[in-house]
């Protein structure tokens, strides 16, 4: 019997894929700029880990953030290990939010990271969505 997605399942899928696209583009932009221009931007991104007591390895942290966005986005789009991938993405957005709040930025600056964090938490809870095999058994 062919599975017809519910409107809830379809809505969840659209939100997950949309965030995945945003993450892939954002991560790709960071990586391509670092590979073609210079790595200063990644060092700046990585330096936010100083808020958590890290005093070195900023370039490594910057690359880790960019790779997390890029490959996390691909995983969200392909619906591959979404719960596992959500954990580093949640950490990434917590760091971003803490950075902007500590800088004194208004919600309009860090609100997007808050939305992304909320979606990642939702994906962590929901996983891939409805289990089609269980639905077929009912």
Protein language model regions, located:
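Extended, low-polarity transmembrane helix blocks
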Residues: 1-37, 59-67, 71-74, 78-138
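Membrane-interface interhelical connector segments
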Residues: 32-57
């Amino acid at each position: 019997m062919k599975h017809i997605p519910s409107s809830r399942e379809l809505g969840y899928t659209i939100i997950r894929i949309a965030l995945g696209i945003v993450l892939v583009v954002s991560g790709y932009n960071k990586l391509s700029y670092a590979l073609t221009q210079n790595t200063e931007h990644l060092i700046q991104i990585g330096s936010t880990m100083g808020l958590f007591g890290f005093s070195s390895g900023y370039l490594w942290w910057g690359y880790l953030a960019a790779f997390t966005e890029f490959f996390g986005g691909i995983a969200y789009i392909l619906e591959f290990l979404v719960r596992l991938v959500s954990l580093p993405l949640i950490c990434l957005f917590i760091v971003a939010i803490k950075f902007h709040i500590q800088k004194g930025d208004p919600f309009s600056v860090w609100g997007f990271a808050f939305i992304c964090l909320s979606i990642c938490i939702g994906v962590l809870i929901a996983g891939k969505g409805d289990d089609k095999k269980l639905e077929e058994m009912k």
